[in-house]
Protein backbone atom coordinates (compact mmCIF):
# COMPACT_ATOMS: atom_id res chain seq x y z
CA UNK A 1 0.00 0.00 0.00
CA UNK A 2 1.50 3.29 -1.08
CA UNK A 3 1.96 6.06 1.42
CA UNK A 4 0.46 9.40 0.47
CA UNK A 5 2.91 12.28 0.61
CA UNK A 6 0.53 14.68 2.30
CA UNK A 7 -2.98 15.02 3.63
CA UNK A 8 -5.42 17.16 1.62
CA UNK A 9 -6.78 20.08 3.60
CA UNK A 10 -10.34 21.44 3.30
CA UNK A 11 -10.66 23.57 0.19
CA UNK A 12 -12.13 27.00 -0.03
CA UNK A 13 -15.41 27.88 -1.67
CA UNK A 14 -13.87 27.89 -5.11
CA UNK A 15 -12.32 24.45 -4.51
CA UNK A 16 -9.13 25.54 -6.24
CA UNK A 17 -5.72 24.10 -5.63
CA UNK A 18 -4.32 27.51 -4.80
CA UNK A 19 -5.92 27.33 -1.34
CA UNK A 20 -4.55 23.90 -0.50
CA UNK A 21 -1.86 23.64 2.11
CA UNK A 22 0.01 20.37 1.90
CA UNK A 23 2.87 18.94 3.86
CA UNK A 24 5.59 16.97 2.14
CA UNK A 25 6.78 14.06 4.24
CA UNK A 26 10.39 14.48 5.31
CA UNK A 27 10.62 18.14 4.28
CA UNK A 28 9.87 20.45 7.16
CA UNK A 29 9.54 24.17 6.70
CA UNK A 30 8.16 24.13 3.15
CA UNK A 31 5.41 26.68 3.59
CA UNK A 32 4.10 29.21 1.14
CA UNK A 33 5.67 32.56 1.89
CA UNK A 34 3.99 35.89 1.24
CA UNK A 35 5.98 36.38 -1.95
CA UNK A 36 5.41 32.91 -3.41
CA UNK A 37 3.46 32.75 -6.65
CA UNK A 38 3.50 30.66 -9.79
CA UNK A 39 3.86 33.79 -11.88
CA UNK A 40 7.04 34.78 -10.11
CA UNK A 41 8.45 31.27 -10.11
CA UNK A 42 7.71 30.75 -13.80
CA UNK A 43 9.18 34.06 -14.80
CA UNK A 44 12.48 32.47 -15.86
CA UNK A 45 15.20 35.02 -16.62
CA UNK A 46 14.83 38.47 -15.18
CA UNK A 47 13.18 41.28 -17.05
CA UNK A 48 15.27 42.48 -19.94
CA UNK A 49 17.13 39.17 -20.26
CA UNK A 50 14.64 37.20 -22.35
CA UNK A 51 12.29 37.64 -25.25
CA UNK A 52 9.49 35.44 -26.48
CA UNK A 53 8.11 34.93 -29.97
CA UNK A 54 4.45 35.92 -29.97
CA UNK A 55 3.16 32.80 -31.74
CA UNK A 56 4.85 30.26 -29.50
CA UNK A 57 3.33 28.67 -26.40
CA UNK A 58 4.22 30.70 -23.36
CA UNK A 59 5.03 27.75 -21.12
CA UNK A 60 7.43 25.83 -23.33
CA UNK A 61 8.69 27.89 -26.27
CA UNK A 62 10.76 30.53 -24.54
CA UNK A 63 14.23 31.87 -25.04
CA UNK A 64 16.86 29.18 -24.88
CA UNK A 65 20.14 30.91 -25.20
CA UNK A 66 21.93 34.13 -25.98
CA UNK A 67 24.92 33.60 -28.22
CA UNK A 68 27.76 36.10 -28.40
CA UNK A 69 31.12 35.99 -30.15
CA UNK A 70 33.90 38.16 -28.86
CA UNK A 71 36.11 40.45 -30.83
CA UNK A 72 37.97 43.45 -29.42
CA UNK A 73 35.28 46.03 -28.69
CA UNK A 74 32.52 44.02 -30.37
CA UNK A 75 29.88 41.58 -29.19
CA UNK A 76 27.69 39.98 -31.83
CA UNK A 77 24.46 38.74 -30.37
CA UNK A 78 21.61 36.58 -31.61
CA UNK A 79 18.55 35.26 -29.79
CA UNK A 80 17.33 31.71 -30.28
CA UNK A 81 13.71 31.08 -29.47
CA UNK A 82 11.53 28.02 -29.30
CA UNK A 83 12.26 24.30 -29.16
CA UNK A 84 11.77 21.15 -31.23
CA UNK A 85 10.33 21.79 -34.68
CA UNK A 86 9.28 25.28 -33.56
CA UNK A 87 12.78 26.70 -33.21
CA UNK A 88 13.20 30.12 -34.74
CA UNK A 89 16.17 32.38 -34.52
CA UNK A 90 15.92 36.17 -34.40
CA UNK A 91 19.31 37.43 -35.43
CA UNK A 92 20.47 40.88 -34.62
CA UNK A 93 23.92 42.37 -34.43
CA UNK A 94 24.94 45.30 -32.33
CA UNK A 95 28.24 47.01 -31.74
CA UNK A 96 28.92 48.21 -28.23
CA UNK A 97 31.66 48.52 -25.71
CA UNK A 98 31.43 45.48 -23.45
CA UNK A 99 33.56 44.75 -20.44
CA UNK A 100 33.29 41.58 -18.35
CA UNK A 101 33.61 42.06 -14.61
CA UNK A 102 35.49 38.94 -13.56
CA UNK A 103 36.17 40.43 -10.14
CA UNK A 104 32.52 40.25 -9.06
CA UNK A 105 32.38 37.39 -6.55
CA UNK A 106 28.62 37.10 -6.88
CA UNK A 107 28.45 36.78 -10.66
CA UNK A 108 30.40 33.52 -10.67
CA UNK A 109 28.00 31.97 -8.15
CA UNK A 110 24.88 33.08 -9.98
CA UNK A 111 25.99 32.02 -13.46
CA UNK A 112 29.08 29.78 -13.56
CA UNK A 113 31.10 29.33 -16.72
CA UNK A 114 31.62 26.13 -18.70
CA UNK A 115 34.67 26.20 -20.96
CA UNK A 116 34.72 24.14 -24.17
CA UNK A 117 38.33 23.45 -25.14
CA UNK A 118 40.19 21.09 -27.43
CA UNK A 119 42.17 20.92 -30.65
CA UNK A 120 40.84 22.14 -33.99
CA UNK A 121 38.12 20.03 -35.61
CA UNK A 122 37.54 18.06 -32.43
CA UNK A 123 33.80 18.86 -32.50
CA UNK A 124 33.42 21.62 -29.90
CA UNK A 125 31.17 23.90 -31.95
CA UNK A 126 29.12 20.95 -33.20
CA UNK A 127 28.40 19.93 -29.61
CA UNK A 128 27.29 23.44 -28.75
CA UNK A 129 25.04 23.75 -31.81
CA UNK A 130 23.38 20.35 -31.38
CA UNK A 131 22.73 20.61 -27.64
CA UNK A 132 21.72 24.26 -27.31
CA UNK A 133 20.69 25.31 -30.83
CA UNK A 134 18.80 22.17 -31.92
CA UNK A 135 20.90 21.91 -35.06
CA UNK A 136 20.65 18.63 -36.92
CA UNK A 137 23.86 16.57 -36.57
CA UNK A 138 24.12 16.31 -40.35
CA UNK A 139 24.12 20.11 -40.67
CA UNK A 140 27.21 20.40 -38.47
CA UNK A 141 29.29 19.10 -41.39
CA UNK A 142 29.01 22.58 -42.90
CA UNK A 143 30.12 24.50 -39.81
CA UNK A 144 33.22 26.59 -40.25
CA UNK A 145 36.07 26.44 -37.77
CA UNK A 146 35.67 28.80 -34.84
CA UNK A 147 38.19 31.63 -35.05
CA UNK A 148 37.14 33.66 -32.02
CA UNK A 149 36.01 33.03 -28.47
CA UNK A 150 32.24 32.58 -28.45
CA UNK A 151 30.18 33.03 -25.30
CA UNK A 152 26.67 31.69 -24.90
CA UNK A 153 24.33 32.49 -22.02
CA UNK A 154 22.05 29.59 -21.11
CA UNK A 155 19.12 30.73 -18.97
CA UNK A 156 16.47 28.06 -19.39
CA UNK A 157 15.29 27.92 -15.78
CA UNK A 158 16.25 29.01 -12.31
CA UNK A 159 18.36 25.88 -12.00
CA UNK A 160 19.95 25.85 -15.47
CA UNK A 161 21.87 29.12 -15.60
CA UNK A 162 25.41 29.16 -16.90
CA UNK A 163 27.67 30.45 -19.65
CA UNK A 164 29.43 28.36 -22.29
CA UNK A 165 32.70 29.66 -23.67
CA UNK A 166 33.83 28.01 -26.91
CA UNK A 167 37.58 28.42 -27.41
CA UNK A 168 39.08 28.06 -30.89
CA UNK A 169 41.54 25.21 -31.06
CA UNK A 170 44.24 27.30 -32.71
CA UNK A 171 44.32 29.97 -29.99
CA UNK A 172 47.15 29.68 -27.50
CA UNK A 173 45.44 31.11 -24.45
CA UNK A 174 48.62 30.59 -22.42
CA UNK A 175 50.34 33.25 -24.49
CA UNK A 176 51.77 36.02 -22.25
CA UNK A 177 49.41 38.52 -23.86
CA UNK A 178 46.38 36.41 -22.86
CA UNK A 179 45.16 36.64 -19.27
CA UNK A 180 44.13 33.02 -18.72
CA UNK A 181 43.88 33.54 -14.95
CA UNK A 182 40.96 35.86 -15.54
CA UNK A 183 39.17 33.12 -17.49
CA UNK A 184 39.75 30.25 -15.07
CA UNK A 185 39.00 32.24 -11.93
CA UNK A 186 35.23 32.15 -12.43
CA UNK A 187 34.95 28.79 -14.18
CA UNK A 188 32.74 26.01 -12.85
CA UNK A 189 33.59 23.27 -15.35
CA UNK A 190 36.19 22.76 -18.05
CA UNK A 191 35.20 20.39 -20.87
CA UNK A 192 38.10 19.16 -22.99
CA UNK A 193 36.98 17.50 -26.24
CA UNK A 194 39.19 14.78 -27.76
CA UNK A 195 38.57 13.37 -31.25
CA UNK A 196 38.59 9.60 -30.72
CA UNK A 197 39.03 8.93 -34.44
CA UNK A 198 42.24 10.94 -34.68
CA UNK A 199 45.69 10.60 -33.13
CA UNK A 200 45.06 11.92 -29.63
CA UNK A 201 48.64 12.22 -28.37
CA UNK A 202 48.76 15.95 -29.09
CA UNK A 203 45.34 16.35 -27.52
CA UNK A 204 46.52 14.59 -24.34
CA UNK A 205 49.52 16.93 -24.14
CA UNK A 206 47.24 19.96 -24.48
CA UNK A 207 44.83 18.46 -21.93
CA UNK A 208 47.62 18.07 -19.38
CA UNK A 209 48.85 21.62 -19.93
CA UNK A 210 45.34 23.06 -19.69
CA UNK A 211 44.35 21.14 -16.57
CA UNK A 212 47.54 21.91 -14.65
CA UNK A 213 47.39 25.63 -15.44
CA UNK A 214 43.69 25.86 -14.63
CA UNK A 215 44.06 23.96 -11.36
CA UNK A 216 46.72 26.39 -10.13
CA UNK A 217 44.29 29.26 -10.65
CA UNK A 218 41.08 27.59 -9.45
CA UNK A 219 41.10 24.32 -7.51
CA UNK A 220 37.29 24.08 -7.60
CA UNK A 221 37.00 23.52 -11.37
CA UNK A 222 35.36 20.28 -12.48
CA UNK A 223 37.47 18.75 -15.24
CA UNK A 224 35.44 16.81 -17.81
CA UNK A 225 36.89 14.95 -20.81
CA UNK A 226 34.60 14.19 -23.76
CA UNK A 227 35.98 11.33 -25.86
CA UNK A 228 34.06 12.48 -28.91
CA UNK A 229 33.02 11.05 -32.30
CA UNK A 230 32.74 7.50 -30.98
CA UNK A 231 29.84 6.76 -33.35
CA UNK A 232 32.35 5.48 -35.91
CA UNK A 233 34.00 3.03 -33.50
CA UNK A 234 33.02 -0.50 -32.58
CA UNK A 235 32.02 -1.24 -28.99
CA UNK A 236 35.33 -2.92 -28.25
CA UNK A 237 37.27 -0.05 -29.80
CA UNK A 238 35.29 2.46 -27.71
CA UNK A 239 36.19 0.70 -24.48
CA UNK A 240 39.84 0.35 -25.48
CA UNK A 241 40.10 4.01 -26.50
CA UNK A 242 38.52 5.21 -23.26
CA UNK A 243 40.81 2.98 -21.19
CA UNK A 244 43.92 4.19 -23.04
CA UNK A 245 43.04 7.89 -22.75
CA UNK A 246 42.08 7.48 -19.09
CA UNK A 247 45.34 5.71 -18.30
CA UNK A 248 47.61 8.15 -20.16
CA UNK A 249 45.91 11.28 -18.80
CA UNK A 250 46.07 10.12 -15.19
CA UNK A 251 49.65 8.90 -15.57
CA UNK A 252 50.68 12.36 -16.79
CA UNK A 253 49.06 13.95 -13.74
CA UNK A 254 50.70 11.42 -11.41
CA UNK A 255 54.13 12.14 -12.92
CA UNK A 256 53.55 15.84 -12.22
CA UNK A 257 52.55 15.13 -8.61
CA UNK A 258 48.92 16.14 -9.20
CA UNK A 259 47.12 12.91 -8.30
CA UNK A 260 44.43 14.87 -6.45
CA UNK A 261 43.11 16.30 -9.72
CA UNK A 262 40.07 14.27 -10.76
CA UNK A 263 39.19 13.84 -14.43
CA UNK A 264 35.76 12.55 -15.52
CA UNK A 265 35.57 10.77 -18.88
CA UNK A 266 32.55 10.42 -21.17
CA UNK A 267 32.05 8.67 -24.53
CA UNK A 268 30.05 11.10 -26.66
CA UNK A 269 28.59 11.53 -30.11
CA UNK A 270 26.22 14.09 -31.60
CA UNK A 271 24.44 11.32 -33.54
CA UNK A 272 22.85 9.83 -30.43
CA UNK A 273 21.80 10.99 -26.97
CA UNK A 274 25.17 10.37 -25.35
CA UNK A 275 26.17 14.03 -25.70
CA UNK A 276 23.00 15.14 -23.88
CA UNK A 277 23.55 12.65 -21.08
CA UNK A 278 27.18 13.76 -20.69
CA UNK A 279 26.18 17.43 -20.57
CA UNK A 280 23.49 16.56 -18.03
CA UNK A 281 26.08 15.13 -15.67
CA UNK A 282 28.33 18.15 -16.16
CA UNK A 283 25.54 20.63 -15.45
CA UNK A 284 24.32 18.70 -12.40
CA UNK A 285 27.65 19.29 -10.69
CA UNK A 286 27.03 23.05 -10.99
CA UNK A 287 23.59 22.94 -9.33
CA UNK A 288 23.89 23.48 -5.56
CA UNK A 289 20.29 22.33 -5.04
CA UNK A 290 20.95 18.90 -6.61
CA UNK A 291 20.78 16.90 -3.33
CA UNK A 292 17.45 18.52 -2.50
CA UNK A 293 16.04 17.77 -5.95
CA UNK A 294 17.19 14.15 -5.80
CA UNK A 295 15.67 13.74 -2.35
CA UNK A 296 12.35 15.13 -3.58
CA UNK A 297 12.35 12.71 -6.52
CA UNK A 298 13.17 9.75 -4.27
CA UNK A 299 10.29 10.60 -1.94
CA UNK A 300 7.95 11.10 -4.89
CA UNK A 301 8.63 7.79 -6.68
CA UNK A 302 8.70 5.72 -3.50
CA UNK A 303 5.23 6.91 -2.52
CA UNK A 304 3.71 6.78 -6.01
CA UNK A 305 4.75 3.39 -7.38
CA UNK A 306 6.92 4.98 -10.08
CA UNK A 307 9.94 3.13 -11.43
CA UNK A 308 12.03 6.05 -12.72
CA UNK A 309 11.67 9.84 -12.83
CA UNK A 310 13.65 12.61 -14.50
CA UNK A 311 13.46 16.36 -14.00
CA UNK A 312 14.14 17.71 -17.49
CA UNK A 313 15.03 21.10 -18.85
CA UNK A 314 12.80 20.88 -21.92
CA UNK A 315 14.75 23.41 -23.97
CA UNK A 316 18.06 21.55 -24.00
CA UNK A 317 16.81 18.05 -22.99
CA UNK A 318 19.33 18.08 -20.18
CA UNK A 319 18.05 16.33 -17.09
CA UNK A 320 19.04 18.36 -14.07
CA UNK A 321 18.10 15.67 -11.55
CA UNK A 322 16.89 12.09 -11.30
CA UNK A 323 16.21 9.63 -8.51
CA UNK A 324 18.84 7.39 -6.97
CA UNK A 325 18.14 4.38 -9.22
CA UNK A 326 20.66 3.81 -12.06
CA UNK A 327 20.12 5.66 -15.34
CA UNK A 328 19.62 3.44 -18.38
CA UNK A 329 20.57 4.94 -21.74
CA UNK A 330 17.47 3.59 -23.48
CA UNK A 331 15.26 5.05 -20.77
CA UNK A 332 16.86 8.44 -21.19
CA UNK A 333 16.47 8.28 -24.98
CA UNK A 334 12.76 7.50 -24.61
CA UNK A 335 12.34 10.56 -22.38
CA UNK A 336 14.11 12.80 -24.91
CA UNK A 337 11.99 11.45 -27.76
CA UNK A 338 8.83 12.01 -25.75
CA UNK A 339 9.76 15.62 -25.07
CA UNK A 340 10.42 16.20 -28.78
CA UNK A 341 7.05 14.71 -29.76
CA UNK A 342 5.08 16.60 -27.13
CA UNK A 343 6.69 19.96 -27.82
CA UNK A 344 6.46 19.69 -31.61
CA UNK A 345 2.78 18.78 -31.48
CA UNK A 346 2.08 21.51 -28.92
CA UNK A 347 3.73 24.16 -31.09
CA UNK A 348 1.46 23.14 -33.97
CA UNK A 349 -1.87 22.39 -32.28
CA UNK A 350 -1.57 23.97 -28.85
CA UNK A 351 -2.57 27.53 -29.69
CA UNK A 352 -6.07 28.91 -30.05
CA UNK A 353 -7.53 29.85 -33.42
CA UNK A 354 -6.49 33.48 -33.04
CA UNK A 355 -2.97 32.42 -32.04
CA UNK A 356 -3.37 33.81 -28.54
CA UNK A 357 -3.51 32.24 -25.13
CA UNK A 358 -1.31 29.86 -23.22
CA UNK A 359 -1.92 26.25 -24.24
CA UNK A 360 0.12 24.95 -21.31
CA UNK A 361 -0.48 25.53 -17.64
CA UNK A 362 0.22 23.66 -14.43
CA UNK A 363 -2.46 21.05 -15.26
CA UNK A 364 -0.97 20.10 -18.65
CA UNK A 365 0.02 16.45 -19.03
CA UNK A 366 1.12 13.97 -21.69
CA UNK A 367 0.69 10.19 -21.57
CA UNK A 368 2.29 7.66 -23.92
CA UNK A 369 1.59 3.95 -23.45
CA UNK A 370 4.25 1.54 -24.70
CA UNK A 371 3.78 -2.04 -25.86
CA UNK A 372 5.69 -3.45 -22.87
CA UNK A 373 3.02 -2.37 -20.32
CA UNK A 374 5.03 0.75 -19.45
CA UNK A 375 3.50 4.22 -19.37
CA UNK A 376 5.46 7.43 -20.01
CA UNK A 377 3.93 10.24 -17.98
CA UNK A 378 4.96 13.88 -18.47
CA UNK A 379 3.87 16.71 -16.19
CA UNK A 380 4.87 20.34 -16.39
CA UNK A 381 6.65 21.60 -13.28
CA UNK A 382 7.48 25.13 -14.44
CA UNK A 383 7.70 26.97 -17.72
CA UNK A 384 11.06 25.34 -18.44
CA UNK A 385 11.03 22.14 -16.38
CA UNK A 386 9.09 18.93 -16.91
CA UNK A 387 8.85 15.73 -14.89
CA UNK A 388 8.99 12.57 -17.00
CA UNK A 389 8.11 9.30 -15.24
CA UNK A 390 8.17 5.61 -16.09
CA UNK A 391 5.16 3.85 -14.58
CA UNK A 392 3.83 0.30 -14.87
CA UNK A 393 0.24 0.06 -16.11
CA UNK A 394 -0.96 -1.50 -12.87
CA UNK A 395 0.59 1.36 -10.88
CA UNK A 396 -0.82 3.95 -13.28
CA UNK A 397 -4.31 2.82 -12.33
CA UNK A 398 -3.76 4.87 -9.16
CA UNK A 399 -3.35 8.02 -11.24
CA UNK A 400 -5.18 10.11 -8.64
CA UNK A 401 -2.57 9.24 -6.04
CA UNK A 402 0.25 10.02 -8.49
CA UNK A 403 -1.29 13.39 -9.38
CA UNK A 404 -1.78 14.35 -5.76
CA UNK A 405 1.79 13.41 -4.87
CA UNK A 406 2.97 15.35 -7.91
CA UNK A 407 1.12 18.40 -6.60
CA UNK A 408 3.11 18.12 -3.37
CA UNK A 409 6.33 17.59 -5.35
CA UNK A 410 5.67 20.59 -7.59
CA UNK A 411 4.95 22.79 -4.60
CA UNK A 412 8.25 21.79 -2.99
CA UNK A 413 10.13 22.51 -6.24
CA UNK A 414 8.60 25.98 -6.31
CA UNK A 415 9.79 26.54 -2.76
CA UNK A 416 13.32 25.66 -3.84
CA UNK A 417 12.94 28.10 -6.74
CA UNK A 418 11.83 30.84 -4.38
CA UNK A 419 14.80 30.35 -2.07
CA UNK A 420 17.21 30.50 -5.01
CA UNK A 421 15.55 33.59 -6.50
CA UNK A 422 15.77 35.43 -3.18
CA UNK A 423 19.42 34.41 -2.82
CA UNK A 424 20.27 35.63 -6.33
CA UNK A 425 18.49 38.95 -5.82
CA UNK A 426 20.22 39.45 -2.47
CA UNK A 427 23.65 38.79 -3.96
CA UNK A 428 23.02 41.10 -6.88
CA UNK A 429 21.90 43.83 -4.49
CA UNK A 430 25.04 43.36 -2.37
CA UNK A 431 27.29 43.47 -5.43
CA UNK A 432 25.88 46.91 -6.32
CA UNK A 433 26.57 48.38 -2.88
CA UNK A 434 29.53 50.77 -2.74
CA UNK A 435 32.51 49.34 -0.94
CA UNK A 436 33.26 51.17 2.29
CA UNK A 437 36.88 51.73 3.14
CA UNK A 438 38.74 53.37 5.94
CA UNK A 439 38.07 53.11 9.65
CA UNK A 440 35.15 53.83 11.94
CA UNK A 441 35.29 56.83 14.33
CA UNK A 442 36.75 54.64 17.08
CA UNK A 443 39.58 53.51 14.81
CA UNK A 444 38.47 49.91 14.23
CA UNK A 445 38.32 48.57 10.65
CA UNK A 446 35.03 49.15 8.90
CA UNK A 447 33.21 45.90 8.08
CA UNK A 448 30.46 45.79 5.46
CA UNK A 449 27.79 43.29 6.55
Swiss-Prot record:
Residues 14-24, 32-47 have a biased composition (Acidic residues). Expressed in the distal tubule of the kidney. Its EC number is 3.6.5.-. The keyword Cytoplasm applies. It catalyses: GTP + H2O = GDP + phosphate + H(+). GTP binds at residues 120-126, 140, 146, 169, 228-229, 231, 270. Keywords: Cytoplasm, GTP-binding, Hydrolase, Lysosome, Membrane, Nucleotide-binding, Nucleus. Residues 1-55, 428-449 are annotated as: Disordered. One of its GO terms (biological process) is positive regulation of TORC1 signaling. Gene3D superfamilies: 3.30.450.190, P-loop containing nucleotide triphosphate hydrolases. One of its GO terms (molecular function) is molecular adaptor activity. It comes from the Eukaryota. One of its GO terms (cellular component) is lysosomal membrane. GDP binds at residues 121-126, 140, 144, 146, 228-229, 231, 269-270. InterPro entries: Gtr1_RagA, P-loop_NTPase, RagC/D. The activation of RagD/RRAGD is mediated by a GTPase activating protein (GAP). In high-amino acid conditions, activated by GTPase activating protein FLCN that stimulates RRAGD GTPase activity to turn it into its active GDP-bound form. In response to amino acid depletion, the GATOR1 complex inactivates RagC/RRAGC by securing the GTP-bound inactive form. It is found in: Cytoplasm; Nucleus; Lysosome membrane. The keyword Coiled coil does not apply. Guanine nucleotide-binding protein that plays a crucial role in the cellular response to amino acid availability through regulation of the mTORC1 signaling cascade. Forms heterodimeric Rag complexes with RagA/RRAGA or RagB/RRAGB and cycles between an inactive GTP-bound and an active GDP-bound form: RagD/RRAGD is in its active form when GDP-bound RagD/RRAGD forms a complex with GTP-bound RagA/RRAGA (or RagB/RRAGB) and in an inactive form when GTP-bound RagD/RRAGD heterodimerizes with GDP-bound RagA/RRAGA (or RagB/RRAGB). Forms a heterodimer with RRAGA in a sequence-independent manner and RRAGB. Heterodimerization stabilizes RRAG proteins. The GDP-bound form of RRAGD (in complex with the GTP-bound form of RRAGA or RRAGB), interacts with RPTOR, thereby promoting recruitment of mTORC1 to the lysosomes. Component of the lysosomal folliculin complex (LFC), composed of FLCN, FNIP1 (or FNIP2), RagA/RRAGA or RagB/RRAGB GDP-bound, RagC/RRAGC or RagD/RRAGD GTP-bound, and Ragulator. Interacts with NOL8. Belongs to the GTR/RAG GTP-binding protein family. This is Ras-related GTP-binding protein D.
Amino acid sequence: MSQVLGKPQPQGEDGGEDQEEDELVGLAGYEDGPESSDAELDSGPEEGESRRNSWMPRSWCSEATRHECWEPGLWRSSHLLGIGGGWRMLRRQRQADFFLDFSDPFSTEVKPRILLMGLRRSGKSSIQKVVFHKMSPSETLFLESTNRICREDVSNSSFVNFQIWDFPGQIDFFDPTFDYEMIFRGTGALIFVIDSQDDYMEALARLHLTVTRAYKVNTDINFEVFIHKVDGLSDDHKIETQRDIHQRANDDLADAGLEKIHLSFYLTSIYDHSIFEAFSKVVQKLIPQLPTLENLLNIFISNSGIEKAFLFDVVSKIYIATDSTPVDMQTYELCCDMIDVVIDISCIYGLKEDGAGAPYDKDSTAIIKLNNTTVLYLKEVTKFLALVCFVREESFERKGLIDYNFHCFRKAIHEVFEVRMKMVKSRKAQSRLPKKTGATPNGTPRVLL
